[in-house]
Curated annotation (Swiss-Prot):
Role according to the record: This is one of the proteins that bind and probably mediate the attachment of the 5S RNA into the large ribosomal subunit, where it forms part of the central protuberance.
GO biological process: translation
Assigned GO CC terms: cytosolic large ribosomal subunit
Record keywords: Ribonucleoprotein, Ribosomal protein, RNA-binding, rRNA-binding
Family: Belongs to the universal ribosomal protein uL18 family.
Short name of any one Pfam family annotated for the protein: Ribosomal_L18p
GO molecular-function term, one example from the UniProt record: structural constituent of ribosome
Protein name: Large ribosomal subunit protein uL18
Oligomeric form and interacting partners: Part of the 50S ribosomal subunit; part of the 5S rRNA/L5/L18/L25 subcomplex. Contacts the 5S and 23S rRNAs.
The keyword rRNA processing is annotated on this UniProt entry: no
CDD domains: Ribosomal_L18_L5e
Length: 117
């Protein structure tokens, strides 16, 4: 089993547990160059809010898009957009990534901006 397959296995297991709870999920996906965040409805069929470093509005403010500062900017943006839609409580879905570095920076920034998980 390679690194990617192991990550996907971990992510699938966590998602099944979150689906049983029926919780709104804050999903994070990370690549070496960008970081993406989405708030997904409890049934999993609808993306309610999204933000990423691919967006010009976010990328223009940053020195680079693959670092902790960029992840924090995405975390703050996703929290603001979610709160505007009336979403306060979410479950954090780290997609099998280790809770460290950019994933942790995004989560911390989202919490500071008012999102609860």
């Amino acid at each position: 089993m390679d690194k990617k397959a192991a990550r996907i296995r971990r992510a699938t297991r966590a998602r099944r547990k979150l689906q049983e709870l029926g919780a709104t999920r804050l999903v994070v996906h990370r690549t070496p160059r960008h970081i993406y965040a989405q708030v997904i409805a409890p049934n999993g069929s609808e993306v309610l809010v999204a933000a990423s470093t691919v967006e010009k509005a976010i990328a223009e403010q940053l020195k680079g898009t693959g670092n902790k500062d960029a992840a924090a900017a995405v975390g703050k943006t996703i929290a603001v957009r979610a709160l505007e839609k009336g979403i306060k409580d979410v479950s954090f879905d780290r997609s099998g990534f280790q809770y460290h570095g950019r994933v942790q920076a995004l989560a911390d920034a989202a919490r500071e901006a008012g999102l609860q998980f």
